[in-house]
């Protein structure tokens, strides 16, 4: 006897929500059996992903959650443009996402919020038997990482980092070459992320991407929260951009694992210089001391002997005409 399957049991049997959403044919589900995806965080990244979700006819977004009414207004225009029903809105304070996850019948939730909220939102979703796709990073501490793993294993809910670099065509091509043995035994891999983000971290408080040197409460969009990490932390803030593609090539967590690392940064100069160059020495932000060094270099030792070197620069690169540069090498 053939056993019928509904949307929820189908998603639970899939490897990850992202795969189910991106590769299944659009006519797989009946109109009453569409995947129900909630969105937490409707900023510029959330708006872009909402558009991609709504491009699929087998996906509905019945609910969204955000505390910024400006961003909610912007994402609602995406629904209107695509002639989709206006979603239910949860915007009653920073903890209202818990109400959404507890009350709504969702197959999955996509999270694009300030980084410190990723972990509690992922945990809350999985506790409510909802699969999760979260923007990077999924966690800020080792304990939070293990918390995500333990909760996923206990609840049976998937938790996926939406590391888009892993799915670049060139990256996947090299991964296939590695698995086919084209390069022989790998001994060392390098990953780098060089992206001048100063125009993202500072703006005029009215729009994104430059035009001023404000951040925090006076900033707009990502500058409201993202820049503070550069004030408080000295670290590789984007390890998965470099490490994500390398990990499957070295079979990390598939018979190999990372054992220990050393990480060193240069002095911090670029952020302060940007403020002075664009706001003057008299601007209050010119006096702020940033902990994040301009260049961060990390070397990782693996259990099977390989080494990994990661390089991060969110300030400047050698070619000013190329504001984003992601490089990889395998040896």
Each PLM stretch: what is its role?
Residues 298-304:
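Active-site beta-strand termini and strand-to-loop segments that position acidic
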Residues 41, 154-160, 165-289:
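Predominantly a Rossmann-like dinucleotide-binding segment in NAD(P)-dependent oxidoreductases
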Residues 294:
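Short, small/polar residue-rich loop motifs at catalytic or cofactor-binding pockets
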Residues 307-309:
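Short, mixed charged/polar active-site loops
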Residues 135-137, 163:
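Short beta->alpha connector loops at strand-helix junctions that form conserved
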Residues 2-134, 143-146, 150-158:
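N-terminal glycine-/serine-/threonine-rich beta1-alpha1-beta2 phosphate-ribose binding loop
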Residues 140-143, 169:
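Conserved PLP phosphate-binding loop immediately N-terminal to the Schiff-base lysine helix
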Residues 313-330:
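Residue-level detector of conserved catalytic or cofactor/ligand-binding positions
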